[in-house]
Amino acid sequence: MGNLFKIGQIINTHGIKGEVKVYPLTEDVNKFKRLETVLVGGEEKKILGVKFQKDRVILKIEGIDSMNDAETYKQKYIEIPRENEPELPPDTYYVSDLKECTIYDTNEKEIGRIFDVISTPNNDVYWIKEPKELLIPVLRDIVLDIDIKLKKIIIKPVGEWQDED
């Protein structure tokens, strides 16, 4: 678990006055309104303005005053210190922590590392890309143990809950 929390990624410029378009990495996009400062590419910056556009956040950030300035920040992450985040209830995890975990089955066979967590109406799904793409439904009878400190998740062997090909 890192000390910084990624809450967004700058994906493009917005307009000519240095605003940036951000892809939010948090479910609570209103969090951007509550923040006074953030780290952008490791540099502390003040947030001067926040607007929302569909599924994106438009930010005006201190020191980014033109489209050319904004271009240099494309693909950089917006981060905040972890201590600014609320404590989670039991059996609830931050996606950024899960993405640091490797999944093993009960036979200690390594399945892969979580690439992303997909939210669906019924349950989340762990997306493994390598060594073989696999979607793992996050259900109590499949996901048996999650140890964030050890970055290790234990699941039932794949053949017990899905046909192996």
Curated annotation (Swiss-Prot):
GO terms for cellular component: cytoplasm; ribosome. It is found in: Cytoplasm. PANTHER family: RIBOSOME MATURATION FACTOR RIMM (PTHR33692:SF1). This is Ribosome maturation factor RimM. NCBIfam families: 16S_RimM (TIGR02273). It comes from Clostridium beijerinckii (strain ATCC 51743 / NCIMB 8052) (Clostridium acetobutylicum). Binds ribosomal protein uS19. Keywords: Chaperone, Cytoplasm, Ribosome biogenesis, rRNA processing. Coiled coil: none annotated. Its main location: cytoplasm.
